[in-house]
């Protein structure tokens, strides 16, 4: 804690204020923002073309779990020699309209791979941003890097997505 003492007309007054954040504190704060941005960009889902139409697929934690469960079912179909009989139904959206789509094994695996690639790309982008922040040696460099990487703009965009989709996620949770 920092403080000051002031004598004025035989009165003693004090002022106390919190310490300035350290370099590590500043980096940690920015990393929380990057984690938030990354998580939102994963959870917002992805667009995927299927049979000539581009659909939006949500990818919240429940959807990710469902993809994993369906992958197990698809793997079992192959193990049982029933790959050609495999069918998966999945919800895709165009605008505000939801469609139930039917995928055969190969089509579903393509969707599954695309979803994984999208998640991996978002994670990779977050790691690159964190590496750039980690390389900063002073608080001034951190501030400059935040501006260069447009972290504040990315965070605002992520907050807008959270509001639009009603996601229950906050920077403070990261």
How would you name each of these model-derived features?
Residues 2-174:
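A preference for well-ordered globular domain cores
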């Amino acid at each position: 804690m920092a403080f000051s003492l002031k004598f004025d007309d035989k009165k003693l007054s004090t002022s106390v204020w919190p310490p300035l954040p350290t370099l590590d504190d500043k980096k940690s704060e920015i990393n929380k923002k990057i984690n938030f941005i990354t998580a939102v960009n994963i959870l917002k889902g992805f667009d995927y073309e299927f049979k000539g139409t581009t659909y939006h697929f949500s990818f919240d934690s429940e959807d990710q779990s469902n993809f994993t469960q369906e992958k197990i079912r698809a793997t079992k179909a192959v193990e049982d020699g029933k790959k050609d009989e495999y069918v998966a139904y999945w919800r895709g959206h165009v605008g505000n309209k939801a469609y139930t789509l039917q995928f055969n094994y190969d089509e579903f695996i393509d969707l599954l791979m695309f979803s994984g690639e999208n998640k991996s790309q978002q994670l990779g982008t977050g790691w690159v941003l964190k590496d750039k922040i980690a390389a900063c040696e002073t608080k001034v460099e951190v501030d400059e890097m935040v501006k260069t990487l447009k972290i504040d703009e990315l965070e605002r965009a992520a907050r807008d997505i959270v509001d639009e989709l009603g996601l229950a996620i906050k920077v403070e949770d990261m």
